[in-house]
Amino acid sequence: MEGPLSVFGDRSTGEAIRSQNVMAAASIANIVKSSLGPVGLDKMLVDDIGDVTITNDGATILKLLEVEHPAAKVLCELADLQDKEVGDGTTSVVIIAAELLKNADELVKQKIHPTSVISGYRLACKEAVRYINENLIINTDELGRDCLINAAKTSMSSKIIGINGDFFANMVVDAVLAVKYTDIRGQPRYPVNSVNILKAHGRSQIESMLINGYALNCVVGSQGMLKRIVNAKIACLDFSLQKTKMKLGVQVVITDPEKLDQIRQRESDITKERIQKILATGANVILTTGGIDDMCLKYFVEAGAMAVRRVLKRDLKRIAKASGASILSTLANLEGEETFEATMLGQAEEVVQERICDDELILIKNTKARTSASIILRGANDFMCDEMERSLHDALCVVKRVLESKSVVPGGGAVEAALSIYLENYATSMGSREQLAIAEFARSLLVIPNTLAVNAAQDSTDLVAKLRAFHNEAQVNPERKNLKWIGLDLVHGKPRDNKQAGVFEPTIVKVKSLKFATEAAITILRIDDLIKLHPESKDDKHGGYENAVHSGALDD
């Protein structure tokens, strides 16, 4: 009879692995916990080559961490997903997921099967989303532009630009509204990527500016070129305009020295013909990702066109989208002939090189296909400018979500407290085992107001108790249902009406973070076995060629 099956690796099962996973999740949450809320603290991260990042953004912190534990990796990916999908709420989603896991682990230790906990969590999440949509949303139509500004300010409150909240909130709202376009279905769309953010260190935050048009951090290729072109026809090229040289390995055998001159002449004529084909279509602004040599620049100067070299591929794509141009990586068509048609050109009202701040920039104004906007950020140093850019990205995403979903919910822990009370009452109406899981889900949500209060150096127990009392009153007594907007005022350390105070978050941020946190917690809860294979040794059996020779393994 054979012995038991051996697994080449470390195997841990049951309670041990579940506790391990919960601890890993809790340690990840503890890293970002102190950065939550308007008085959250920043993290300084130094990578292996010594690059420093100072940030308050949950997704950025977790992206820069080198995490080995598989369960902790799930939470890091969760923050990244929240950042890509919604753009904000990355810290809170990780904290909620870790708290859900911690409470689920307590239930499993009390001999409640993980499957019961999972089904309870799923039910609680579904009920929570339904309750938000039915009772807690505020329609943005009745609040207008103020609502957008307040949502942006709420997003920025914990960030470095929170001090100048009004200034940046107005800038963000104007930028998002500037890039609005209508898609095929007639729905308004707000592509946040169309807002180009440039950073220039020096001066103060308040001297940042919003520019109507696409700002390129480049200058014209030659001093002799025009600096301003009206009714621009833009060609976007993804190749270099330089004297064509023969490929390596090409050999030409010539018998007459004059032929050598002809070859050189032909090399320069090939590029000249390309430029003439481009200019013949009426193009007067040429943007290329490659270089343009002096010989080619001469033709553009003579034609009165503006040529810009070394444009970033990312910028070129955005300009092509905004102006209606096609990006060409070659002029060759399917027959192998080189052609350039006028339909490939984009259009803009004006392209001008201006000195803004301390740098020369090229501005592309009033593009034909879509409008575009650019923000130039000023700050004391590069770390500050980078963090300002991350903060602005979050705020832009928030404003976009509010405009697309047309609804917001009160911030400052109001939603979590309301859901906690509702789910506690809902749990008591359940007759099955899920009752305990739903009650734990309700308790887990209180981690958000709790953490907010702790980070603000307030008495969290007292504040959360008051908050729960208000929300309980709102749900029990229909006459006092306006109390459901009560959230925390962390500066003064007391509950307040966050609808009046203008603390708003997009509904989708709350709904998605609940769903994502629940799914992540369930994914980790389902794991009851971890098999970690031993890494294969790099050397072969004899430890390399030299050892093999010495040991005689190569002798026949």
Swiss-Prot record:
Organism classification: Eukaryota, Metazoa, Chordata, Craniata, Vertebrata
Q: Does the keyword ATP-binding apply?
A: yes
InterPro entries, per the entry: Chap_CCT_alpha, Chaperone_TCP-1, Chaperonin_TCP-1_CS, Cpn60/GroEL/TCP-1, GroEL-like_apical_dom_sf, GROEL-like_equatorial_sf, TCP-1-like_intermed_sf, TCP-1_chaperonin
Which Pfam family is one of those matched by this entry?
A: Cpn60_TCP1
Sorted alphabetically, the Gene Ontology BP terms of this entry are: binding of sperm to zona pellucida; chaperone mediated protein folding independent of cofactor; chaperone-mediated protein folding; positive regulation of establishment of protein localization to telomere; positive regulation of telomerase RNA localization to Cajal body; positive regulation of telomere maintenance via telomerase; protein folding; protein stabilization
What's one GO MF term for it?
Answer: protein folding chaperone
Q: Which PROSITE patterns match?
A: TCP1_1 (PS00750), TCP1_2 (PS00751), TCP1_3 (PS00995)
Which organism does this record belong to?
Rattus norvegicus (Rat)
Annotated protein name in UniProt: T-complex protein 1 subunit alpha
Top enzyme class: hydrolase
Function text: Component of the chaperonin-containing T-complex (TRiC), a molecular chaperone complex that assists the folding of actin, tubulin and other proteins upon ATP hydrolysis. The TRiC complex mediates the folding of WRAP53/TCAB1, thereby regulating telomere maintenance. As part of the TRiC complex may play a role in the assembly of BBSome, a complex involved in ciliogenesis regulating transports vesicles to the cilia.
Q: Which residues carry the post-translational modification Phosphotyrosine, per the record? A: 181
Q: Could you tell me where this protein is found in the cell?
A: Cytoplasm, Cytosol; Cytoplasm, Cytoskeleton, Microtubule organizing center, Centrosome
**What reaction(s) does this enzyme catalyze?**
ATP + H2O = ADP + phosphate + H(+)
Subunit structure as annotated in this protein's UniProt entry: Component of the chaperonin-containing T-complex (TRiC), a hexadecamer composed of two identical back-to-back stacked rings enclosing a protein folding chamber. Each ring is made up of eight different subunits: TCP1/CCT1, CCT2, CCT3, CCT4, CCT5, CCT6A/CCT6, CCT7, CCT8. Interacts with PACRG. Interacts with GBA1. Interacts with DLEC1.
NCBIfam families linked to this entry: chap_CCT_alpha (TIGR02340), thermosome_alpha (NF041082), thermosome_beta (NF041083)
Keywords of the record, alphabetical order, are: Acetylation, ATP-binding, Chaperone, Cytoplasm, Cytoskeleton, Hydrolase, Magnesium, Metal-binding, Nucleotide-binding, Phosphoprotein
Q: Which E.C. number(s) belong to this protein?
A: 3.6.1.-
